[in-house]
Curated annotation (Swiss-Prot):
Enzyme nomenclature, EC number: 5.3.1.24
Cross-referenced InterPro entries: Aldolase_TIM (IPR013785), PRAI_dom (IPR001240), RibuloseP-bd_barrel (IPR011060), TrpF_fam (IPR044643)
Reaction catalysed by this enzyme: N-(5-phospho-beta-D-ribosyl)anthranilate = 1-(2-carboxyphenylamino)-1-deoxy-D-ribulose 5-phosphate
Source organism of this protein record: Acidithiobacillus ferrooxidans (strain ATCC 23270 / DSM 14882 / CIP 104768 / NCIMB 8455) (Ferrobacillus ferrooxidans (strain ATCC 23270))
Pathway as given in its UniProt record: Amino-acid biosynthesis; L-tryptophan biosynthesis; L-tryptophan from chorismate: step 3/5
Transmembrane domains' residue ranges: none
Tree of life domain: Bacteria
Protein name: N-(5'-phosphoribosyl)anthranilate isomerase
Lineage, highest ranks first: Bacteria, Pseudomonadati, Pseudomonadota, Acidithiobacillia, Acidithiobacillales
Molecular function terms from GO: phosphoribosylanthranilate isomerase activity
Family designation: Belongs to the TrpF family.
SUPFAM superfamilies noted in UniProt: Ribulose-phoshate binding barrel
Length: 205
């Protein structure tokens, strides 16, 4: 099985960013969604991005943001990939000249082909648990199933932590996994030991 990539999301400070990279994360996520306890402004985000070493992908998470707000963030922050967590249209997602990931909110096995077709130019699709009234990551898991080969990288998120990620990977066989609350001490504050254990469990699959 190919190596499963790892993204640690909800980074809010330089210390956690460096620790995520040192643990072996392939990507880190910064949240630009004001209602999130992990939300950042551009000034803080720039400091975090500057602290990351080379070859760590910098992902910016947005939820139903206005196109002008996304563009303004991109002018100030050197993001590599955009992640859209709301009801964004394909035309909005592709309108910034950056690779993007579209999040799909799911509860169990479903046909992913319509989303693959609609967001055909997405770099990947991220599957997160659908929770009423919750945007930007629910922290809840859903019933994993064997993900189909649709010619598009599929990323697994939602309620993952060191104790269940190996099982999730064995069942779903995703391209990558995405974790936030599962490696935290409190919302927005990462537990460096949990991050290291999570990465070790993924690398051990």
């Amino acid at each position: 099985m190919p190596m499963v990539r790892i993204k640690i999301c909800g980074i809010t400070n330089t210390e956690d960013a460096r620790a995520a990279a040192a643990a072996g994360a392939d990507a880190v996520g910064l949240v630009f969604y004001r209602s999130s306890p992990r939300a950042l402004d551009a000034v803080r985000a720039r400091k975090i991005l500057a602290a990351l070493p080379p070859f760590v992908t910098r992902v910016g998470l947005f939820v139903n943001a206005e196109a002008a707000d996304v563009a303004a963030t991109l002018q100030q922050c050197p993001l590599d990939v955009l992640q859209f967590h709301g009801d964004e249209s394909p035309s909005l997602c592709r309108g910034f000249g950056r690779p993007y990931i579209k999040v799909l909110r799911v509860t169990a096995a479903q046909d992913l082909r319509p989303a693959v077709d609609a967001y055909h130019d997405a770099q990947g699709l991220l599957l997160d648990c659908a929770a009423p009234g919750v945007w930007g990551g629910s922290g809840r898991s859903f019933d994993w199933w064997r993900l189909p080969d649709l010619g598009k990288p599929l990323i697994l998120a939602g309620g993952l932590h060191a104790e269940n990620v190996a099982e999730a990977i064995a069942i779903a066989r995703p391209y990558a996994v995405d974790v936030s609350s599962g490696v935290e001490l409190s919302p927005g504050r990462k537990d460096h030991d949990k991050m290291a254990r999570f990465v070790a469990r993924v690398r051990g699959t």
